[in-house]
Amino acid sequence: MNHDQQIVTRFYMAVDALYALGEIKSFRHFEREIGADHSVFYELRKNERKRTFMHPAWLRHLVVTYSISADWLLVGEGAMFR
């Protein structure tokens, strides 16, 4: 898995963790929050081989809105949450 795929994988790990904690009501609700097309969001979530690109605004939303650590999200260092 290349570096870009690792970032996308951590993005979806964070989304799953936020859903499990009840911070995200549903994946559809989160898709609307970030302005994501359902089919794109779903395909990236389910198909690891297609994880070659992530919208920067989606990453920023996790960092700003949900206190996900940018260090963890981008380079895999430290804890998931700030």
Question: Locations of the language-model features?
Answer:
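Residues within the alpha-helical elements of helix-turn-helix
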Residues: 33, 65
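Short, basic-rich loop-to-helix N-cap that marks the start of a DNA-contacting helix
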Residues: 24, 48-64, 80
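A short, Lys/Arg-rich alpha-helix, primarily the initiator
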Residues: 1-29
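Recognition helix of helix-turn-helix/homeodomain-like DNA-binding domains
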Residues: 35-54
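Pre-recognition alpha-helix immediately N-terminal to the DNA-recognition helix
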Residues: 10-13, 40, 58-61
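Key DNA-contact positions within bacterial/archaeal DNA-binding proteins
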Residues: 28, 39, 71
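Short, charged recognition helix plus adjacent turn
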Residues: 1-2, 74-82
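Hydrophobic/aromatic-rich, well-ordered segments within soluble, folded domains that form packed cores
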Residues: 68-70, 74
